[in-house]
Amino acid sequence: RLVGSEMCIRDSHGVFPEETALGQKFVVSAVMYTETRPAGLADDLSASINYGEVSHMITDFLQKNTYKLLEAAVENLAELLLLSLPLLKKITLRIEKPWAPVGLPLKTVAVEITRGWHTAYVAFGSNMGDKKKYLDNAIQGLRDMKEIVVEKVSEYLVTEPYGGVEQDEFLNGALRVRTLLCPEELLDRLHVLEQAADRKRIIHWGPRTLDLDILFYDNEIIDTEVLHVPHIDMENRDFVLKLSLIHISEP
């Protein structure tokens, strides 16, 4: 990892008018997680992250953008760095505001977050209308989202429906993505794509224009009212376990 500590920037972020009008000091620290061994063995800066360039990126971003909250500044800055630096896997970013107008002898206030890339596996399927077009459009929709990188897509497989409802056969598959989204945010994006395909949730196990499910998200186990990871119905989906996941899990 690379560490850059306590870079001072004068800028105009804050809730109160005088903060944005007069400006004040902000202190930024970053811990950047990357593989340092290739650069260390080759003594080659191009194999690592140039922390000088990163320092200028941070300064330019904070001086060109204005936020009321430190939370917003640090979130947007972390996203910029993760999207801009291919070798950056994860970052712990801290922004301090030592001149915060709290009216008390306080040394500093700060917001610190850790954000990074995650690996998720998503199953897709359709058994209504132009099935291939629905799947193609969904995959392109994922590619168009800046927080998602589609790394690998399985072949489309024809599978028989199950669940006791008489309906047409499915076209199914799975894909692997890298994403900056948390599991719930990723689920919301999948639902947006389903809605764009006019998905109707009328009959349980019924026909659908588009079905998108999170199978895995890193090594997390999630059990909430809206999300279950690993997906609770995987054992009934031979196309996922036998073919699609095997294909997209390969390097």
Listing of model-derived features with the role each one plays in the protein:
Residues 18-87, 92, 237:
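Histidine-centered catalytic/metal-coordination loop motif
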Residues 10-19, 159-160:
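Glycine-rich, charged/polar anion/phosphate-binding loops
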Residues 37-52, 137, 142-182:
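Short, surface-exposed acidic-centric catalytic microdomains
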Residues 3, 26-28, 120, 171:
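Hydrophobic core residues within well-ordered beta-strands of beta-rich domains
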Residues 119-139, 147:
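Extended accessory regions or peripheral subdomains of proteins
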Residues 2-3, 7-8, 250-251:
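Short, small-residue-biased leader/transition segments that mark boundaries at the very start
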Residues 95-116:
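Short, low-complexity, polybasic intrinsically disordered segments
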Residues 35-40, 117-119, 162-171, 181-188, ...:
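Flexible, gly/pro- and Lys/Arg-enriched active-site loops
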